Amino acid sequence: MKQIVIAVCALLAAAALFSGEVAAQGQPNMYGPTVTADQAKSVAAAAVAEARKNQWTMAVAIVDPAGDLVYFEKMDNTQVGSVDVAIAKARSSARFKRPTKAFQDALAAGGEGWRLLSLEGAVAVEGGVPLDVGGKIIGAIGASGGAAQQDGVTAAAGAGTLK
């Protein structure tokens, strides 16, 4: 019984710490209507154009607010492993309503940031960005194929097409 009480107290303490960190960051935007197929294609086209401009090869995934795939594009010669990573980055960004770089930075800072390792579906690598229209998150984009910063630049270029 004592072990159960200790475990419950530990869980409550962890929840309190995490909620305080989220509150300090400000509340993320609310979800809006789901990204349309046309919007998804436009976002992906802008991301691919940015990658081509920089001579990067990328996999680009667009998901709805639940993290379900809406559109996907893999540029020629993109490493196969980037397919699943792009989808995971988009899904993480949509479900947690923040760029995956926020997780990357928190994990790199150590300390309480290590808690991210226990969040199922949280990807702590730059390259996932929420799609925000009028202050509402309608989905997310994930890009993978280059260095993390290149993935982030590519995803941001796509996300920047929606306002």
Regions found by a protein language model. Name each.
Residues 7-21:
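Bacterial N-terminal signal peptides
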Residues 1-4:
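Positively charged n-region of N-terminal signal peptides that target proteins for export
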